[in-house]
């Protein structure tokens, strides 16, 4: 079962031993946990879901005006079968997405955005998630024996990405009753926050290789470890396989993901706290940007080969 803990945004409460210990244990044991964050503006999340529904229910021609241009830019609309999170499977994902990388840099020109109101809302929610990200990453730095501000310069927003997602409702076809809507994968960066609207679908692979359904609990954020965090912690925090599978939902499934991915020039090598004589460093130093870009390009390579991007 996925652990759940209450996460205070205030510095004084967060730095107490118990929240730090539970955060560390949850990330070690599962690579996934669910947070209750009393100070989080859940009403704004409701507005984000409303904006997401309004965008995705527009005509395809209107959505295509804001089309995804390239994996390097990582911004814009993608339709069904335009991404393969598990490229080795040869299957495209049955989802739509509106991806917003580095929103801070795009806070000016409106041509990339459906409307000024949509832009303002997404920027506000992005900054809200950024605050939550800072509170968690500073705590992880303390756990790892690093300066509390270790991530401040490494997570300025260059690769930090907000993503709106829509998965289609089930049809009467039995072949689609348990269809995989987003292929099994691990996330690429440091941490991911996932917000769900109530329709289930996320499945996480446990240590025995069994897929476990994650309930869609209102006013909670699911946090999972990414590949770079696994490397930094020398496998102490696992980047766990997960996917989205059709659960017979009668309505479309909407979710919002926030990817806390480090700046491109950040070197990632196992932290000394997690390296011992019994457990030597398992990874060579890599650049964050090279890893993230390679993963993004792999998930879009079928499209590039077909000349669709």
Regions found by a protein language model. Give the residues of each.
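Peripheral, non-catalytic segments flanking oxidoreductase cores
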Residues: 1-309
């Amino acid at each position: 079962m996925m652990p759940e803990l209450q996460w205070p945004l205030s510095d004084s409460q967060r730095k107490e031993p118990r929240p730090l210990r539970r955060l560390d244990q949850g990330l070690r044991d599962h690579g996934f946990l669910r947070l209750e964050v009393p100070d989080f503006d859940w009403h704004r999340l409701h507005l984000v879901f409303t904006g997401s529904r309004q965008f995705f229910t527009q005509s395809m021609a209107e959505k295509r005006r804001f089309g995804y241009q390239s994996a390097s830019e990582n911004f814009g609309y993608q339709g069904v079968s335009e991404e393969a999170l598990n490229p080795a499977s040869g299957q495209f994902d049955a989802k739509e997405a509106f991806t917003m990388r580095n929103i801070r840099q795009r806070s000016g020109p409106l041509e990339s955005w459906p409307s000024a109101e949509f832009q303002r809302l997404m920027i506000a929610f992005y900054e809200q998630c950024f605050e939550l990200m800072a509170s968690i990453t500073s705590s992880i730095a303390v756990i790892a024996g690093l300066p509390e501000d270790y991530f401040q310069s490494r997570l300025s927003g260059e690769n930090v990405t907000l993503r709106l997602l829509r998965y289609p409702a089930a049809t009467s076809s039995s072949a689609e009753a348990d269809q995989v809507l987003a292929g099994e994968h691990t996330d690429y960066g440091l941490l991911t926050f996932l917000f769900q609207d109530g329709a289930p679908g996320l499945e996480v692979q446990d240590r025995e290789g069994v897929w476990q359904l994650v309930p869609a609990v209102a006013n909670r954020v699911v946090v999972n470890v990414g590949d770079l965090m696994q490397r930094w912690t020398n496998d102490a925090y696992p980047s766990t396989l997960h996917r989205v599978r059709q659960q017979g939902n009668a309505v479309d499934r909407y979710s919002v993901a926030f990817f806390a991915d480090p700046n491109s020039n950040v070197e990632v090598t196992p932290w000394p706290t997690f390296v011992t004589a019994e457990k030597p460093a398992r990874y060579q130093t890599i650049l964050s940007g090279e890893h993230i870009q390679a993963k993004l390009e792999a998930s879009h390579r079928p499209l590039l080969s077909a000349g669709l991007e």
